[in-house]
Regions:
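Short, internal active-site loops enriched in acidic
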Residues: 11, 49-51, 83
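Short, flexible N-terminal segments of the mature chain
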Residues: 18-38
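Short, conserved charged micro-motifs
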Residues: 13-17, 52-54
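Short acidic DE-rich linear segments
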Residues: 103-108
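Short, mixed-charge low-complexity intrinsically disordered segments
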Residues: 62-93, 97-99
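Short, intrinsically disordered low-complexity segments
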Residues: 32-69
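Short, low-complexity, polar/charged sequence segments that are solvent-exposed and flexible
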Residues: 22-27, 41, 63-64, 97-98
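Short, extreme N-terminal segment that most often corresponds to the first beta-strand
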Residues: 1-14
């Protein structure tokens, strides 16, 4: 089973005048397209041979569309059969690597 969990920082959302619903919308659209369930608020689940791919590809899609997305997160985890990856830290590592190539924005 593959899961993707979103936990937002309520204070940061409030300061930015954003809502969880607004920030979850891209994932919900992606989930609808790829038959990914959301059994709990902000918790997406899929099983099967394509589960890792279809859930995992949402992470770069979301952060490419909004590089500040992770600024609003307390937790964002990708779990493949119990092996958990911190999407916030992995995104920061990716940006650091890409910045060396002059591709992504600088962290504040």
């Amino acid at each position: 089973m593959v899961t993707l969990k979103f936990v937002f920082n309520q204070e940061k959302l409030k300061q930015a005048r954003k809502t969880e619903e607004e920030l979850l919308q891209p994932m919900r659209e992606h989930a609808k397209k790829y038959d990914i369930a959301e059994p709990e608020h902000g918790f997406f689940v899929k099983d099967g041979e394509d589960a890792m791919c279809v859930i995992g590809m949402a992470v770069p899609d979301i952060t490419d569309a909004d590089p500040h997305y992770i600024d609003y997160m307390d937790e964002w985890t990708f779990d493949v059969d119990g092996e958990v990856e911190d999407c916030i830290e992995e995104t920061k590592k990716w940006w650091k690597h890409e910045r060396k190539r002059g591709v992504y924005y600088d962290e504040e």
